[in-house]
Amino acid sequence: MAYDEKLIAALKSKAKTLRRDTIEMIKAGGAGWLGGSFSQADIITALMFHHLKHDPGNPKWEERDRLIVSKAHCCETVYAALGEAGYFDKKEYRSYGKFGAVLQAHTERIVPGIEYSGGSLGQGLSFALGEAMAARIGRPTPLYRVFCILGDGECNEGQVWEAVMAAAHYKVDNLVAIIDHNKFQSGSKVEDRINLIPMVEKWQTFGWNAVEIDGHNYTEILTALENADKTPGQPHAIVAHTVKCKGVPAFEHKNLHFCKLTDDMYAEAMAVLG
């Protein structure tokens, strides 16, 4: 599917802004989840600034689409997107991760625009499934859609697959799971812990409409999201192949999970993103 070049350029520019603001947040907070935040930045951008139905002026609008970030530690790009969209003042970035601040190191629902208070991995898809089923109660068509971003490492958790089975059984077709498949988790490559390959076929076998894409290619991201709306009767999985730390070439493909930014790292990142 072809998209307007101006739209793609605008989304790329927005993603660069989110990555830059993420660097500023992590620098202000002393440390943060750099790699996983950067790998999901293009997905977050496509959702927040093109695909989702939401209203920053009315964060609790009943018909809004829900974005559940199960990998809730990678909250920095989510906060950056919400601030950029106007859910809160960007000055909140400066207090990220500090005691008593609104923006903490995992997503919390006290933050305008955040739908899910995260922490332990593997739980977000179950929460998203409940939200998606609630949207269908007493209605011929769902009131809203639910999008859940998972890390590939957290797919080691059995609870994820319980939710996968339940969603397929109940044909919850207003639920879209997006797997940020950057191939790393805390401490190792994902394949060295529990090998999840073939990822797409697993979701398909469990009864999902599953596809795989380049998670940094906006045409592929937007096409997959739009196609999910056109395929009734099944929940949808998008396995997005991504690069950890995408956006700063010197950091890419490195397992910079939770890290402190040195002055040199900050300068290197801002030379690309600033």
Regions found by a protein language model. Give the residues of each.
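Short acidic, glycine/serine/threonine-rich loops at helix termini
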Residues: 79-81, 108, 159-161, 187-191, ...
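Generic beta-sheet signal
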Residues: 65-67, 144-148, 175, 234-242
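Thiamine diphosphate
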Residues: 113, 117-120, 124-231
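Glycine-rich beta-alpha junction loops
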Residues: 73-74, 78, 182-183, 217, ...
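Cofactor-binding active-site loop characterized by glycine-rich and histidine/acidic residues
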Residues: 22-25, 37-169
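Glycine/aspartate-rich loop-and-adjacent alpha/beta segment that forms the canonical ThDP
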Residues: 218-274
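N-terminal hydrophobic or amphipathic helices/low-complexity stretches enriched
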Residues: 1-18
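N-terminal capping segment at the start of a domain
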Residues: 14-31, 180-182
